[in-house]
Regions:
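Short, acidic/polar
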Residues: 40-51, 95-104
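A short alpha-helix capping/helix-coil boundary motif
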Residues: 26-29, 51-54, 78-83, 103-104, ...
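N-terminal amphipathic alpha-helix/helix-capping segment at the start of soluble metabolic enzymes
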Residues: 1-44, 73
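Detector for Asparagine
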Residues: 8, 19, 54-56, 100, ...
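Active-site-adjacent beta->alpha loops and helix N-cap segments on the catalytic face
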Residues: 64-79, 93-98, 116-132, 140
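Hydrophobic faces of well-ordered beta-strands that scaffold small-molecule active sites
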Residues: 31-39, 59-62, 84-88, 113-115, ...
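Catalytic domains of carbohydrate-active enzymes, especially glycoside hydrolases
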Residues: 47-67, 104-112
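Active-site cofactor/substrate anionic-group-binding motifs, chiefly glycine-
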Residues: 59-61, 73-97, 101-108
Length: 140
C-alpha cells in the first residue's frame, strides 16, 4: 500500500476575507460526487447570502420553507460563486409549478434542484423529462 503524501498547497487569504465558514478538513478525504465533471465533496445548507459568499464548501443547497419564487432563485444563483442546488417546491407547491420552477432554475444556472417530501413520483418524472440537471428529493 502506498503512503499518501500530503501536498503543500499555497494558501492566500486577504485581510477582509480571512474569516469564513470552513468545512471540516477531513471532508477532503472523502470521494465526493461528480456532477457534470465537477467533483463536489462538501455542501453548505443555507439561503443566507452572507454565508454563501463566505464559505469554502464546494456547493450550496438552498431550500427554504416558503413557496419558491424565480426572483429568490435568481438572487441565490447570482450570489453563489460555487454550484448551487435550489429548492423548487414539493411541500405546498405542487404540480406544473414545480416543473416550471425547475426549468427556470436550470435556465438561471443552478447545478441542480431540490424537491421536498411529499413530492409525488409523477412530479419527479415530469421534472426529469423537462430539465437536464440533477434532482434531489428530500425524505422525512
Amino acid at each position: 500500500m502506498e503512503i499518501k503524501r500530503k501536498k503543500n498547497v499555497p494558501e492566500i487569504k486577504g485581510i477582509l476575507r480571512s474569516n469564513v465558514i470552513e468545512v471540516p478538513s477531513c471532508i477532503r478525504d472523502c470521494s465526493g460526487i461528480k456532477i457534470f465533471g465537477k467533483r463536489l465533496k462538501s455542501f453548505l445548507f443555507t439561503t443566507d447570502v452572507a454565508l454563501i459568499r463566505n464559505t469554502n464548501a464546494d456547493a450550496i443547497i438552498a431550500v427554504y420553507p416558503f413557496t419558491p419564487q424565480p426572483l429568490i432563485t435568481e438572487a441565490l444563483v447570482m450570489a453563489a460563486d460555487v454550484p448551487i442546488f435550489c429548492g423548487v417546491g414539493g411541500g405546498i407547491t405542487q404540480g406544473k409549478r414545480v416543473v416550471n420552477l425547475g426549468l427556470d432554475a436550470e435556465f438561471k444556472g443552478a447545478m441542480g434542484v431540490v424537491v421536498n417530501a411529499p413530492t409525488s413520483n409523477e412530479i419527479v418524472e415530469n421534472l426529469r423529462e423537462t430539465i437536464d440537471i440533477p434532482i434531489i428529493v428530500t425524505v422525512v
